[in-house]
C-alpha cells in the first residue's frame, strides 16, 4: 500500500491524516514538536466548521468550549462597539485541540514521527524523498501542512521568506473576567490585541 507523508501536525495536517487513515490510506505525520504543546495562533474556531467536525467525530465537546456570539472592536483612540457575531464560533486552546486531534489520529491508525523536523523535500521520478536530521523517508504523495516561515520555506527558496516582517505575534493565557461569549479586537498604534475565552 502506498503511503502519504504529511509534513506538519497542526489542524490541517492532523485532520488530513485522520481522513486518509479512515479511507485506509497509510499515513505518516512528521511534526517537529511533541504533543501537547502551545502554538502562537488564534484560538477562535468559526462555527462554519462545526458540521464537518461533528460528522467526522472531531468536535471537541468533552472540553465544553465557550460559545462565542458577540464581537467587540475598539479603535486606537479608545472608541469601541459591540455587535452580534452572526455565524459565531467556539473557543479552545490549540494545546488541547491539537492534542485531541493527535489522539484521534492515533486511534485511526496514523503513524507519527514526533520531535522531527523535515530539512529537505525532493521529487525524483514519481517519488518524494524527505530528509530529516536522522533519517530519509520516501512516498509518492506528500502534503505540506507546515505553516509559514519554516525550514522548508527556506530550502524551497520561497520569496516571502526573504522579506522579514516588522511584526511579531505573541499569545498569552490569563485568568480574567471576560464574557465567555465575546471575542474582542483592540487596536493600538502598530498592532492589535485579540481576546477570547477558551475551555
What are these regions (language model features)?
Residues 49-104, 123:
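A conserved beta-strand/loop capping segment in the N-terminal third of enzymes
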Residues 23, 104-199:
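Predominantly flavin-linked oxidoreductase catalytic cores and closely associated redox partners
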Residues 14-15, 47-48:
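Short alpha-helical segment within the catalytic ATP-binding CA
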Residues 15, 19, 142:
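Hydrophobic/aromatic ligand-binding patch that stacks against planar heteroaromatic rings
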Residues 1-12:
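Beta1/beta-strand and adjacent pyrophosphate-binding region of the FAD-binding site
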Residues 7, 18-41:
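Glycine-rich FAD pyrophosphate-binding loop
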Residues 26-27, 59, 111:
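Residue-level detector of anion-binding/catalytic polar loops
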Residues 12, 35, 149:
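Conserved Rossmann-like nucleotide-cofactor binding loop
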Amino acid at each position: 500500500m502506498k503511503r502519504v507523508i504529511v509534513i506538519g501536525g497542526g489542524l490541517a495536517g492532523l485532520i488530513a491524516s485522520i481522513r486518509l487513515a479512515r479511507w485506509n490510506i497509510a499515513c505518516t505525520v512528521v511534526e517537529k514538536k511533541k504533543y501537547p504543546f502551545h502554538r502562537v495562533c488564534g484560538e477562535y474556531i468559526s462555527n462554519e466548521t462545526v458540521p464537518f467536525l461533528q460528522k467526522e467525530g472531531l468536535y471537541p465537546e468533552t472540553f465544553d468550549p465557550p460559545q462565542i456570539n458577540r464581537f467587540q472592536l475598539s479603535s486606537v483612540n479608545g472608541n469601541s462597539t459591540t455587535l452580534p457575531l452572526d455565524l459565531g464560533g467556539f473557543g479552545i486552546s490549540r494545546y488541547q485541540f491539537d492534542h485531541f486531534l493527535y489522539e484521534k489520529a492515533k486511534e485511526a491508525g496514523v503513524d507519527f514521527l514526533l520531535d522531527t523536523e523535515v530539512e529537505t523535500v525532493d521529487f525524483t521520478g514519481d517519488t518524494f524523498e524527505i530528509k530529516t536530521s536522522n533519517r530519509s523517508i520516501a512516498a509518492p504523495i506528500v502534503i505540506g501542512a507546515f505553516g509559514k516561515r519554516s525550514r522548508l520555506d527556506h530550502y524551497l527558496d520561497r520569496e516571502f521568506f526573504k522579506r522579514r516582517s516588522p511584526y511579531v505575534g505573541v499569545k498569552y493565557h490569563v485568568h480574567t473576567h471576560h464574557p465567555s461569549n465575546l471575542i474582542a479586537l483592540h487596536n493600538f498604534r502598530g498592532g492589535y490585541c485579540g481576546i477570547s475565552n477558551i475551555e
